[in-house]
Amino acid sequence: SNRSEIAVGYATMDGDTAGGLAPIGGIDKHFLRKWLRWAEHECPLGLGPISALKFVNEQEPTAELRPAASGQKDELDLMPYEILNAIEAAFVRDRMEPESLLNTLRERFTAYSEKQLRDFLARFYRLWSQNQWKRERYASGFHLDDYNLDPTSWCRYPILSVELKIPD
């Protein structure tokens, strides 16, 4: 699982969470998708573009837990990854209060309605609060930026807690 999925517990226990190392556990999904598109077209000197990534990049992310006919897509289950990652960074790294975070979302994501932004934020808070127990069990991962969700070293949150609320 990547950091975006870890934040909201979008993983199967002893499936995604099994093992001693989570190579992409410290990387958010939005960054990972941009990096894969870059690797498809450019990639580092000497390696050249990896054209086979076209087949990966053409697909919408999906956990594939439901029958294929259901059309399950991660962003339909959760929210757009760009918004999820913006909420995660503002909440975890910047320690923003719910009202300030909602104001930030309003300014940054003008294509979305007030109701959509409130729903995304409420969903994030609900999933974050419900899934600390999963974050406690994830394997260690590489961290490429200035924060992580590792409860043993950076982001401690109580397993038993009330859900965070957005002011009316």
Task: Please provide the spans of the model-predicted regions.
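ATP/NTP-dependent adenylation/nucleotidyl-transfer catalytic domains that generate, transfer
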Residues: S1-D168
